[in-house]
C-alpha cells in the first residue's frame, strides 16, 4: 500500500531498511555521460557507506557482453556480498533475477531502495518507477546519476518526483544512514565525506 505523499517526503533513509542499487555504470557507457567522474565519486562513497553500515548492494549490468562490465573503480569498491546481476530489460524491476533479489530483501524489512547509475532518463528512471509501483520507497541520488544530455536528467527528475520518488544527494544518504555523530561508523566515514 502506498502512503500519502506527505508521509513519503518526510521519510528519512534508514540504513536498516535500505538497499543500494547501482544501475549500469559500465565501461562502454560511462565515458559518454555528463560528468562521469562525479558519478563514480558519488557511487564510490555510497558503496563505502553501504559496506560500513551493512546495507545490501545490488549492481545491475545491461547486456555486459556488448556494453562491458561495471567500471573498475566501482567493481573494486563493491562489498564482497554485493550481487552483480545481468539484465536485458531497461527496468531492473522487469528482470526476474533482480526483482526476486529485491523482493527477498523487502521480506526482511528492507523496503527503501537507494538508486544511482546511468542513464538517468532510461534505466534509472524505469528501474525506480518499476520498483516504486511494487511498493518500494525510492530515493534517487542526484549526484550519482547522469545521462548524455542535461535535459534528459531534468526530464527524469520531474517524472521521478511526480511519481513520489525522492531526489537526494550522496551526503543526504550517508548522513541519514549514519543518523548521529560520535559513533565509530561516523568517524570511519567522515574522512571520505570531507574529501569530497
Language-model segments: residues:
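A short alpha/beta connector and helix-capping loop motif
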Residues: 15-18, 33-61
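A cross-domain feature marking catalytic cores of carbohydrate-active enzymes
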Residues: 25, 59-62, 142
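Active-site-adjacent betaalpha module
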Residues: 2-16, 65-196
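N-terminal nucleotide-binding beta1-loop-alpha1 segment
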Residues: 18-25
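Conserved Rossmann-like nucleotide-binding pocket used by diverse enzymes
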Residues: 21, 58, 114
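Short acidic, Gly/Ser-rich segments with clustered Asp/Glu that frequently serve as metal-coordination loops
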Residues: 27-31
Amino acid at each position: 500500500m502506498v502512503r500519502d505523499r506527505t508521509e513519503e517526503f518526510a521519510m528519512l533513509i534508514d540504513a536498516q531498511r535500505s538497499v543500494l542499487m547501482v544501475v549500469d555504470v559500465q565501461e562502454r557507457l560511462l565515458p559518454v555521460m555528463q560528468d562521469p567522474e562525479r558519478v563514480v565519486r558519488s557511487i564510490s562513497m555510497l558503496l563505502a557507506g553501504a559496506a560500513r553500515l551493512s546495507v545490501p548492494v545490488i549492481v545491475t549490468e545491461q547486456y555486459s557482453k556488448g556494453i562491458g562490465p561495471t567500471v573498475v573503480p566501482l567493481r573494486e569498491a563493491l562489498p564482497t556480498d554485493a550481487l552483480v546481476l545481468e539484465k536485458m530489460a531497461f527496468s531492473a524491476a522487469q528482470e526476474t533475477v533482480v526483482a526476486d533479489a529485491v523482493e527477498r530483501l523487502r521480506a526482511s524489512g528492507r523496503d527503501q531502495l537507494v538508486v544511482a547509475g546511468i542513464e538517468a532518463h532510461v534505466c534509472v528512471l524505469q528501474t525506480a518507477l518499476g520498483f516504486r509501483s511494487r511498493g518500494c520507497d525510492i530515493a534517487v541520488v542526484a549526484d550519482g546519476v547522469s545521462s548524455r544530455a542535461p535535459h534528459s536528467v531534468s526530464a527524469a527528475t520531474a517524472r521521478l518526483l511526480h511519481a513520489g520518488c525522492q531526489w537526494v544527494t550522496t551526503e543526504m544518504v550517508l548522513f541519514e544512514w549514519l543518523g548521529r555523530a560520535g559513533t565509530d561508523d561516523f568517524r570511519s566515514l567522515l574522512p571520505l565525506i570531507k574529501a569530497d
